[in-house]
Amino acid sequence: MTYKPPYEINTSILNKVAAIMKMIGKFSSMNNLSSQPLLIRKNQIKSIHSSLAIENNQLSESQVKDLINGKLVIGPQKDILEVQNAIKVYEHIQDINPYSQKDLLKYHKILMTSLVSDAGSYRKGQVGVFDDEKAIFMAPPTDRVPALMNDLYDYLNHYDENILIKSCVFHYEFEFIHPFSDGNGRMGRLFQTCLLASEEEFFYYLPVESIIKKKQLAYYDAISRSNQEGASTIFIEFMLDAIIETMNDTLKQSNIETGSLSIQAKKLLTVLEEGIPYTTIELMDRVGIKSRASFKKNYLDPLLQSGMIEMTIPKAPNSRNQRYIKK
């Protein structure tokens, strides 16, 4: 009999699945997301940065971008190595078979090479989550890990379930088992993405990790509450919400990439780095325009209206200290 982890499919989950299925239709009907290389690249940077930032990596999104582009980055060597390893994995993300334990071990080895001594192997010791010296969560005993992972992959490969739900269940159960000595969080998030993409390819290009990072406390709370309930239902609901939010954000971005912005606004957008505040003069210099009125009308205002950039002092638009940040 095929193993099934404990969870319930309630009305909330069904409604969220229905909402995602409706949005999948929108993705299918619009221009192929894979034909938008700038958006794909931007989202890949977000995925790598966010998944590692959740694990306390201190490098910024722009530093991750520089490493992807082969530039020199100054920072903690461990953090740089984590990003470099993640880049190697994400370069081959479409080659990953998420239904294979062999691939799980293979890509864990790439992700954690030179970071842990047992990269690519299940843990040999006990692990847990601690607050000071108090154990908040203790993972199952080491000798149970192989059997628990076999059960999880039995569910993954043989139980008939909607992939949206199944991928969330896998993510939660994987984190509960904590099969590796380190790297469990980033592997769980990566393999959920690969499971989703095995059904709908555009999921490769959705930075769900960025929403998880934004709601990191809620992410851990959903895991903790599911642990207490002994079922992954709460976590499934959280992750489905994260997927919905990511899809909405990506649809918005894709519409901008595919022509709803003027050529001038797109030009300004391409020369800005995310999270860096710019003055009006700096922005005008970047696009090579001298007329402040023309710049405001054709470049700046369309991006402000679309929500692609925002003011640092929105309540005082004309402030001399006003800066603009790409979101």
Protein language model annotation of sequence segments:
Residues 1-327:
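FIC/Doc superfamily catalytic core
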